[in-house]
Regions:
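C-terminal structural segments of small proteins and small subunits
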Residues: 102, 109-131
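Ribosome large-subunit tunnel/peptidyl-transferase-proximal elements
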Residues: 1-103, 113, 131-143
Length: 143
């Protein structure tokens, strides 16, 4: 008996929408990362990009558990001497909640070309509206 491997040509991608309102940011990111990788599929193949498209709405209403809203710090470096910038999670959620969600999902994807291509299928929106109604996305509920 041989192992059946998924071919890229036989792949069909679905669209899923996740509502992040009132849900923990990390738990939403885990679910999105698994959908982007395709780990929910029966014919998941680790070396093939077999994931689906994911839309996350209401990223501004996602919550942090514990004291992370005050304690968590996001860092970025400009490359210049003394160019280390830091932003607290509270400020990040007020200004760029979609970017905070993107960083969380990006950290849960593989650090190679499969992760990069999976991240291109992630669509984040601060409000409840999204322009992907023509793709007929299915609602995915968190456990």
């Amino acid at each position: 008996m041989s192992t059946t491997l998924l071919k890229k040509e036989a792949l069909e991608r679905k669209w899923y929408v996740i509502d992040a309102a009132g849900k923990p940011l990390g738990r939403t990111a885990v679910t999105a990362a698994n959908l982007l990788r395709g780990k929910h599929k029966v014919d998941f193949t680790p070396n093939v990009d077999c994931g689906d498209n994911v839309i996350i709405i209401n990223t501004d209403k996602a919550v942090f558990t514990g004291n992370k809203l005050e304690d968590k710090t996001y860092y970025r470096v400009s490359g210049w001497i003394g160019g280390l910038k830091e932003t607290k999670a509270r400020v990040m959620m007020e200004k760029r909640s979609d970017y905070a969600m993107e960083l969380a999902v990006k950290g849960m994807l593989p650090k190679n070309t499969l992760g990069k291509s999976a991240l291109t299928r992630l669509h984040l929106y601060k409000g409840a509206e999204h322009p992907h109604a023509a793709q007929k996305p299915e609602a995915w509920t968190l456990d």
